[in-house]
């Protein structure tokens, strides 16, 4: 019996890593309506059309709605560490997880609806190695975050920690959108770290397109 079990398992154990990996997709023409339960009317009014990410092409994983427009810092110049012209605590959009996910630190994100706000990773010894880029999306419970107004950084960190139920904010890493990126939105896979990155575009308050890239699946290397 043990020998037969081994014969059954052997082909599975020999599969290459890519064969066992979960595939995520961005189905065309999937524009889910934003949720209303637990989401304030103020936030609902500020959302664009939704973008759905699925597992394996059919199973919903999460839906993302960007804000209609983003306030940006005047005369902002990106650096190697800070690439987006946002202010800490700024409202960026909304995300709904149909099933549990994980943030960039590996913390569990329960199914639910969360407000997306901009945050900057502190420059201190507690965050060495997490990411060279300090730009992050911090998630907050939608039923506890009812305004599009900015939130003070310490209050945001405390509120965001409630998503994962720990002491650290629940955070998704922001990345560069490649210069050769063609049509947006798109879902890009980075084999190193097995990251799935949503590349999409919002717009500034002045009407200029502002591409962004957020890691929806995957976490920092330990």
Please place each PLM-identified region on the residue numbering.
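Short consensus segments that form the blades of beta-propeller domains
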Residues: 126-130
């Amino acid at each position: 019996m043990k020998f037969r079990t081994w014969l059954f398992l052997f082909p599975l154990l020999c599969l290459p890593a890519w064969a066992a990996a979960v595939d995520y997709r961005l189905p065309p023409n999937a524009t889910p309506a934003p949720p209303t339960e637990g989401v304030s009317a103020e936030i609902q009014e500020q959302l664009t059309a939704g973008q759905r990410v699925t597992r394996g092409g059919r199973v919903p994983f999460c839906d993302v709605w960007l804000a209609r427009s983003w306030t940006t810092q005047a005369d902002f110049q990106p650096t190697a560490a800070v690439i987006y012209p946002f202010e800490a605590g700024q409202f960026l959009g909304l995300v709904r997880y149909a099933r549990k996910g994980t943030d960039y630190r590996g913390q569990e994100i329960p199914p639910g609806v969360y407000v997306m706000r901009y945050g900057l990773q502190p420059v201190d010894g507690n965050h060495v190695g997490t990411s060279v880029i300090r730009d992050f999306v911090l998630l907050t419970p939608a039923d506890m975050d009812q305004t599009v107004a900015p939130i003070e950084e310490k209050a945001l960190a405390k509120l965001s920690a409630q998503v994962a139920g720990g002491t650290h904010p629940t955070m998704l890493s922001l990345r560069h959108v490649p210069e050769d990126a063609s049509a947006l939105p798109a879902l890009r896979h980075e084999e190193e770290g097995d990251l799935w990155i949503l590349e999409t575009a919002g717009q500034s308050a002045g009407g200029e397109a502002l591409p962004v890239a957020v890691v929806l699946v995957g976490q920092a290397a330990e």
